[in-house]
Amino acid sequence: MTFAAETVSDEMLTRFDVPGPRYTSYPTADRFVEAFASEEYGLALDQRGRGGIARPSPLSVYVHIPFCESLCYYCACNKIITKHHDRAAPYLRYLSREVDLHTQRIGVGQTISQLHLGGGSLTFLSDDELRELMAVFKRSFKLAPGGEYSIEVDPRTVDAARLGVLAELGFNRLSFGVQDFDPAVQKAVHRVQPAEQVFALVEAARARGFESINVDLIYGLPRQSPESFDRTLAQVTALRPDRIALYAYAHLPERFKPQRRIATVELPSAA
């Protein structure tokens, strides 16, 4: 599979340089309202499964694995912090059941062209658990040849051998959670990972045939400055990733308890 490079024009940058919700899922979060209950969702699935949609397009599926061994203070994701890896087994059983419930409505063998595994930390799962998870999808769906099969990777919990397992399972795209390379920023958000560790993993990923590498970055974190973040950007661009996902940190400690561990006085000014 190859990923086509697209030119981003100045006009496009100007057009979309406005505040707005993150377009990270479909339907977007604001579509989920009380009026859209499980019955309505089931009817939508039935319409696809019974031929109500002529020539349905391939599916794009996101799978969430919420487990992490340690807490990143900036995180607003759905997560479970634990070092007890046995907690993953019942979650995976329920996830398999969820897949079965969906295929009962839409039918077995629907084509998936995009499968993304996010979290949480996907590498919290053992190699066998990852194999089991992928077997569920291969049994219930048809994974399109040349599809995009992506997994989020925490550089602190993966090594070159683990990347080999991910390649063996059919993943062709990796997303590395970097956020910032500055040691002071990493300490402030409780996510310490040396830049050299990420560099080595990116090199190992390319050697194992991964076709697309993404790096996640966050601006607005505590102890960041324009100068320090410029250094991070220089290090990231030197890696020549295929994609950079750059997010603004949203400091909402009243909603997300972990963010209360971040000292407000250490947040950079928006000016």
Task: Tell where the protein language model's regions lie, with residue ranges.
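Generic hydrophobic-segment detector
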Residues: 10-17, 32, 66, 108-110, ...
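Short, compositionally biased low-complexity segments
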Residues: 13-17, 70-71, 249-253
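A broad, low-specificity signal for short, low-complexity segments enriched in glycine/proline
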Residues: 17-24, 76-80, 206
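A short secondary-structure junction motif
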Residues: 28-31, 71, 80-81
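C-terminal scaffold of the Radical SAM
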Residues: 51, 55-58, 81-105, 110-271
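Local cysteine-cluster metal-coordination motifs and their immediate loop/turn environment
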Residues: 63-79
